Amino acid sequence: MSENTFSDTTSIYNQNLSNQGFILANLENLVSWARTRSLWPMTFGLACCAIEMMQTAGSRYDMDRYGMLFRPSPRQADVMIVAGTLTNKMAPALRRVYDQMTEPKWVISMGSCANGGGYYHYSYSVVRGCDKIVPVDIYVPGCPPTPEALLYGILQLQKKINRTQQVKFKR
């Protein structure tokens, strides 16, 4: 009786599966899809670019539709958005926050000041680009960059994540 019940259940399952279809994907595509649609940024707002970053998270542009949810702790974040002028005094704090982030981690440099010093490039107290402190994946130009530019940078980061290998297999 138990064999008969098992075969009936299996045949019903197979009929339902053939009627609905199924999805074929490898683990690499699944992990890339999940990571690109659940980016959690850590805000590192240093100047006026941070205002534009906040506007991007508002209701008009709604970063949440891309799966982005700002996290208050670097241990919960996988993307750091450096927005604004990075001074020499703030550089060790930036590196410390970056080191506390979990792997894999990505950095978006937002604005002319974060990209290369911007208006304050020749000042003695300004780091001429946050890429001297942390590795940067995406540069968003502008002074200040518009929310659309930041969203475009986020979309470029998603494309970059899809292109890179996410799963490392041990042999």
Swiss-Prot record:
Chemical reaction(s) catalysed: a quinone + NADH + 5 H(+)(in) = a quinol + NAD(+) + 4 H(+)(out)
Record's protein name: NADH-quinone oxidoreductase subunit B
Cofactor note: Binds 1 [4Fe-4S] cluster.
Stretches of the chain forming a coiled coil according to its record: none
Keyword Cell inner membrane: yes
Phylogenetic classification of the source organism: Bacteria, Pseudomonadati, Pseudomonadota, Alphaproteobacteria, Rickettsiales
Binding residues annotated for [4Fe-4S] cluster, in chain numbering: 48-49, 113, 143
Source organism (scientific name): Orientia tsutsugamushi (strain Boryong)
Gene Ontology CC: plasma membrane; respiratory chain complex I
